């Protein structure tokens, strides 16, 4: 059985909505997960770069791959271990450019694997597993449910969200730099505290 999933890019931290507001964009990664016929073949991960860049070479093709990690978490949640899987990642979303490339492939891997397993996980479980890998749901949630979303993590680790109507006459322009900037480095320049007056409650 083979499952192919297209997942959108996302942009987050819109306006004052730090770690909470996110918006799906019409650029897509495609994740294909296939059960291989021959036992003992293990996990095979293939990368196809559709961005005309060399960024894809930074993506691991072993068990350190974030798609594999997401799939492994889903399998483990139902007491199974992934084996004999062929995973293909087709990237149209630039990597490390603020467009949620990691959220896209995490969500894509989870949805595809969930289909292979007969849908044991509901939306809430998928959000929880994906956020475990991303730490914040602001890119994960719109990647999974689409649209413009405000989301947060409850004390029990579950993700709650509310979708907002995006005005039809609002266009989106995305400026993509020609250099990588990881989320961790971008966050390092931010203040440790923000006053209540400036924050989202």
What name fits each language-model region?
Residues 64-71, 106, 142, 172, ...:
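A general structural signal for well-ordered alpha-helical segments in protein cores
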Residues 122-201:
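ATP-dependent small-molecule kinase catalytic core of the GHMP/sugar-kinase superfamily
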């Amino acid at each position: 059985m083979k499952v192919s999933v297209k997942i959108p890019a996302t942009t987050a931290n819109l306006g004052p909505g730090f770690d909470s507001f996110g918006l799906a964009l019409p650029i897509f990664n495609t994740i294909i997960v296939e059960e291989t016929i021959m036992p003992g073949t293990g996990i095979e991960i293939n990368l196809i770069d559709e961005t005309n860049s060399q960024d894809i070479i930074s993506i691991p093709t072993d068990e350190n791959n974030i798609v594999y990690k997401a799939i492994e978490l889903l399998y483990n949640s139902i007491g199974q271990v992934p084996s004999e899987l062929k995973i293909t990642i087709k990237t149209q979303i630039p990597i490390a450019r603020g467009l949620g490339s990691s959220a896209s492939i995490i969500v894509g891997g989870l949805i595809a694997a969930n289909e292979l397993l007969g849908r044991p996980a509901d939306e809430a479980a998928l959000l929880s597993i994906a956020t475990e890998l991303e730490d914040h749901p602001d890119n994960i949630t719109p990647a999974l449910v689409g649209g413009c979303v405000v989301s947060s993590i409850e004390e029990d680790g579950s993700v709650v969200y509310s979708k907002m109507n995006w005005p039809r006459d609002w266009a989106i322009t995305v400026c993509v730099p020609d250099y990588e900037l990881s989320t961790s480095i971008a966050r390092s320049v931010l203040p440790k505290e923000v006053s209540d007056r400036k924050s989202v409650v």
